[in-house]
Amino acid sequence: MKLETSIYDKLPATTKSGNVVIHKVYQRKGVEYARSIGGAFTLRVRDMDKHFGNPYSHVRALCEKDNLILTATTKDAVIMFIHYVLRSMDSRAVWIRSVLDSKVLVGKPLVYYSELGEPSHANALDYLINNWDEVKSKV
């Protein structure tokens, strides 16, 4: 987890930063909004296999409702998201890596639902998108 933690340490102090934009929208409406601004939606979307949502959360009720993996903190959830993207053989993680390889999202807006006052997995995704070749060489 050394690489994952070092990536987390490079993330901005707030959620709204870089290419991450805040817009309170959810599910397929979020996907539609992100497409309308030429970007990507970063949250989980029900009934979609391919999305950029984080399978980890520090919110117990959300984990129980959406079958997520519980972490102690938001920071832990973000680090675990980085780990998931870099190392998991889950089909969605493999798909995310293929999107990163394509570079189609470099410099594009990434829609997240709220300012957390700390980095979110959307910030981690932004970092991975825009530094993928360097990161990939270290995995």
What residues fall within each predicted segment?
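Catalytic phosphate/metal-binding cores of nucleic-acid and nucleotide-processing enzymes, i.e., regions
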Residues: M1-V139
